[in-house]
Amino acid sequence: MRVLQPLGIVIRLQSPQKYLAFEESQQRSAFLMKPDVTASRDGRVRWILDTKWKELSAGEAKEGVAQSDLYQMYAYASCYNCSEVVLLYPHHGALGQSAGVRATYLLNPWAERASQEPARRVRVATMDLADLKTVPRQLERIVLDYNAQAPVEIADGVPSHALR
């Protein structure tokens, strides 16, 4: 995505690849992970985007985001030491509002507090695919929104924004 190059952000498709585990008895890596899109700056993965082709449903709890998808995002965030991940779904008229970020979840913020690492965040977003020329700008908006986020502090097991 050329629109992010001036920010020093390097976009890669299904790269870098890492393994989630190591099988001790066979002495080999196991469970290859290939995130759909990674964005790096200064050689470090800053965010990961994973595309889903199922439709969200405004009438369902959590709009139908699968728990297994959150587990996958947690694995990516942990293995790539990345604090920002995105689940990206196609937008459709039944969702009502315009495309973009629909929900933000902190991934296991209590454990992160104990380790003194920043909380990991997953955003659920949609993209309007009706006009493919707008896709780069929609992605840019999601990325720039990440860059504008203040770090989340956890105090006594409660995210700081919940204290306001």
Feature annotation, model-predicted:
Residues 1-164:
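Catalytic core segments in nucleotide and nucleic-acid processing enzymes
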